[in-house]
């Protein structure tokens, strides 16, 4: 398994080009199963999870190819409706394949997904939604089967809790259902809107994506077409934090400030000077150390849980005492013990992290445990004194396109070591 060797401290600064949003690309890739016509998807990031999703689709009989930032997908010859275990176990987003399979083919079998180890990440909301649409569900210990005779049937679905994943599953399946589907208490994330816009491009009618009520008018057949994925707001936020903890400056190109308002507000609160344009964001600390802040993770448009670990690091090296409250996932503080090994002064009280800011971190050997925790350790290694070794960096590869090259361009001394 690969590891990073990072020699610090370095000042991270300069320009970075933001990749397409992983959390849009994955559901959109799986949603290509809804149509038998060719689809071209632009601005698709080069990620381990994307590669796995493409392998999964190809094993079902699809013809999917990733060239640079473009994916060409043709699912007209899909001959299997069971997602193979060896691929599903490594990517939790694989549950998104179930809705399109049952909607178009009347049958889908998916092994319970793997990926990150941050909490339970239950799929019950996906299953409840498909049941409401008329799917018959069989639950095994490690798999779920969804089937329907004929077409799914539109329904009024009130989500028990806000869930991006379940909103996408229901919305995708409903595109081929008979009649109208209404989703209340729907997730409002930009990636939900992006997926909805892709489905609209395929020929379905969706109203209200981005609000807590989404209305989908099902159709019998969808067409093909071309679509461009939005920039990754979490990658954008990560590089903004990289400059903030370096007390330096960065310009994030091909980004969208309109989908990052809460993060930008908190960065300004920490002392950052931020300017924005239509497709760029600049941050400048003017050599100042950031000020400690309070954040509380909430569903969009609140503070994103996927930025929690990065802002924990910001508070670790900030002036004063900062507080981080995690309300979305349990067990998402696995980066904290590793930061403490690097010299952080941090306490965990239930779902809250209290950070007493320190001026300097010290390089050491740490282990990455999940995607966002891992990237916080990478950034910590860049500003720490001495050598930091980060094991199990495959987690970072799941969500960040070419991160070492982008950090090297910003001044980091980071090297990937591959064990033979």
UniProtKB/Swiss-Prot annotation:
Subcellular localization: Cytoplasm
Binding site for phosphoenolpyruvate: 22-23
GO molecular function (one): UDP-N-acetylglucosamine 1-carboxyvinyltransferase activity
Active site: 116 (proton donor)
Superkingdom per UniProt: Bacteria
Alphabetical list of CDD domains matching this protein: UdpNAET
Keyword Protein biosynthesis recorded: no
Keywords assigned by UniProt, alphabetized: Cell cycle, Cell division, Cell shape, Cell wall biogenesis/degradation, Cytoplasm, Peptidoglycan synthesis, Pyruvate, Transferase
Pathway: Cell wall biogenesis; peptidoglycan biosynthesis
GO biological process, one term: peptidoglycan biosynthetic process
Classification via SUPFAM superfamilies: EPT/RTPC-like (SSF55205)
InterPro entries membership: Enolpyruvate_Tfrase_dom, Enolpyruvate_Tfrase_sf, MurA_subfamily, RNA3'P_cycl/enolpyr_Trfase_a/b, UDP_GlcNAc_COvinyl_MurA
EC number: 2.5.1.7
Keyword Protein biosynthesis applies: no
Family statement drawn from the similarity comment of this UniProt entry: Belongs to the EPSP synthase family. MurA subfamily.
NCBIfam families: murA, PRK09369.1
Biological function: Cell wall formation. Adds enolpyruvyl to UDP-N-acetylglucosamine.
Name of this protein: UDP-N-acetylglucosamine 1-carboxyvinyltransferase
Organism annotation: Blochmanniella floridana
GN (gene name): murA
């Amino acid at each position: 398994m690969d590891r990073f060797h990072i020699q610090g401290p370095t000042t991270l600064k300069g320009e970075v080009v933001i990749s397409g949003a992983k959390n849009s690309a994955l559901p959109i890739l799986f949603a290509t199963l809804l149509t038998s016509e060719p689809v071209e998807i632009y601005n698709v990031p080069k990620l381990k999870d994307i590669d796995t999703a493409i392998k999964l689709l190809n094993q079902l009989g699809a013809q999917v190819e990733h060239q640079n930032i473009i994916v060409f997908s043709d699912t007209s010859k899909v001959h299997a409706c069971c997602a193979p275990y060896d691929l599903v176990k490594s990517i939790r987003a694989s549950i998104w394949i179930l809705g399109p399979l049952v909607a178009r083919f009347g049958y889908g079998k998916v092994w319970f997904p793997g990926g990150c180890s941050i909490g339970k990440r239950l799929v019950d909301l996906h299953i409840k939604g498909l049941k409401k649409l008329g799917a018959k569900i069989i639950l095994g210990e490690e798999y779920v089967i969804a089937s329907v005779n004929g077409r799914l049937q539109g329904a009024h679905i009130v989500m028990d809790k806000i869930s991006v994943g379940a909103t996408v599953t229901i919305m995708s399946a409903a595109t081929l259902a008979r009649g109208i589907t209404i989703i209340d208490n729907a997730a409002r994330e930009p990636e939900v809107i992006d997926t909805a816009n892709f489905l609209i491009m395929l020929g379905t009618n969706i109203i209200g994506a981005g609000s807590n009520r989404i209305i989908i008018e099902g159709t019998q057949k969808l067409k093909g077409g071309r679509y461009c994925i939005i920039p990754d707001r979490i990658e954008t936020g990560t590089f903004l934090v990289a400059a903030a903890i370096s007390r330096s400056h960065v310009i994030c190109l091909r980004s969208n400030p309109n989908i990052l308002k809460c993060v930008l507000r908190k960065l300004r609160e920490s002392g950052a000077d931020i300017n924005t344009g239509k497709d760029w964001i600049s941050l400048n600390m003017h050599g100042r150390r950031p000020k400690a802040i309070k954040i509380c993770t909430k569903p969009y448009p609140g503070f994103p849980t996927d930025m929690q670990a990065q802002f924990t690091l910001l508070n670790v090296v900030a002036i004063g005492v900062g507080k981080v409250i995690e309300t979305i996932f349990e067990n998402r503080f696995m980066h904290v013990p590793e930061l403490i090994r690097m010299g952080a002064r941090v306490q965990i009280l239930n779902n809250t992290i209290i950070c007493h800011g320190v001026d300097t971190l010290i390089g050491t050997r740490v282990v990455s445990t999940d995607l966002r925790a891992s990237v916080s350790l990478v950034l910590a290694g860049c500003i720490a004194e001495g050598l930091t070794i980060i094991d199990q960096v495959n987690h970072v590869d799941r969500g960040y396109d070419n991160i070492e090259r982008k950090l090297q361009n910003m001044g980091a001394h980071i090297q990937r070591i591959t064990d033979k």
